[in-house]
Amino acid sequence: MIDEVEEIAVKSAYEPGPYGYRPQERPIFLYLDHGLIILDKPKGPSSHEVTERVKRILEYPGKVGHCGTLDPKVSGVLPIVLGNATKLSKFISGYDKEYVGTLYLHGDVPIDELKGALDKFTGPIFQRPPVKSAVKRSLRVRRVYSIELLSSEGRFHKLRVRVESGTYIRKLFFDIGEFLGVGGSMRDLRRIRSGIFTEKDCVTLEDIKDAYDSWRESGDESKIRKVILPLEEAVRHLPKIYVKDSAVASLTHGASLKVKGICSLSRGIKKGSIVALMTLKGELIAIGRALMDFDEMLSADSGVAASIERVIMPRDLYPPMWKTG
């Protein structure tokens, strides 16, 4: 979770001031505004429909979105973002994905021949989005990282597939069938991982309703804080730069991070890499891009350490301290 051990180097020792909150300690309404739900989407409704259902269950007045659309017939891991966390939608949607699905071949094919075809479709492939897709149907390259044959029963073959975001699994299965000369189709599909989030992180719509009802009826926030995660969970895998309170407000206005604003940072940061810019209380300020490597950030007395890719934190949580940052 958020408190997992990181290898951090201290550049300048500072204690957090009175501003902001540790993510798990945000007041409940602010907690919801920075919320992330890893939903186990059921088969049947569309991703949009289950997102709206979550919004209704929580009686949430703000924005609610989902990251990485699943077709109605597909189940599994679907990140849902609330309020301020919707600013992370594009970032979370860009994660690689992992699925388990059934390929039905329309003719008999020897297992060795099928395995050979799966090898052929591992690596960069060309895909054109389906006719019903919401995006422009231009030919694009997507990477298939692995295809594993889990089991076979007659013409039904259970596969585990790890792919780049934006890869159409139904089209992939169809193309494998065409390559084998017998035709093929997808009979079922479940997403078992979206980036760093797996089935183990998932909650159901029923879990969300139970937690919300418990909170509204008894005032007990414990369940709602378990089914809804702080948005910081989405960046737990990223290298981090922790900044002085005096630097926070300028970052929320899109200013680049200067070396003088750094308190501590993850070891091994490379120039050009994506980093999470954090407050001393562990709040995500922005997604940034490192303009120096770790050693340079640690030793430099001046210069710009990171640029801003996407501001996440609202501007009014930390006061401007331009002269002291």
Curated annotation (Swiss-Prot):
Tell me the function of this protein: Could be responsible for synthesis of pseudouridine from uracil-55 in the psi GC loop of transfer RNAs.
The answer to whether UniProt assigns keyword tRNA processing to this entry is yes
Q: Specify one Pfam family.
A: PUA
Report the sequence similarity comment from the record.
Answer: Belongs to the pseudouridine synthase TruB family. Type 2 subfamily.
**Keywords for the protein's UniProt record, in alphabetical order:** Isomerase, tRNA processing
Q: Catalytic residues?
A: D71
- Tell me the superkingdom of the source: Archaea
Keyword Isomerase assigned: yes
Which Gene Ontology MF annotations are present? pseudouridine synthase activity; RNA binding; tRNA pseudouridine(55) synthase activity
Q: Which organism is it from?
A: Korarchaeum cryptofilum (strain OPF8)
Q: What is the uppermost EC class here?
A: isomerase
Looking up InterPro entries in the UniProt record yields:
Dyskerin-like (IPR012960), PsdUridine_synth_cat_dom_sf (IPR020103), PsdUridine_synth_N (IPR002501), PUA (IPR002478), PUA-like_sf (IPR015947), PUA_sf (IPR036974), tRNA_PsdUridine_synth_B_fam (IPR004802), TruB_arch (IPR026326)
Q: What is this protein called?
A: Probable tRNA pseudouridine synthase B
Looking at the record, the residues that make up the PUA domain are 238-313
Per its record, the protein catalyses: uridine(55) in tRNA = pseudouridine(55) in tRNA
Its EC number(s)? 5.4.99.25
GO BP term, pick one = mRNA pseudouridine synthesis
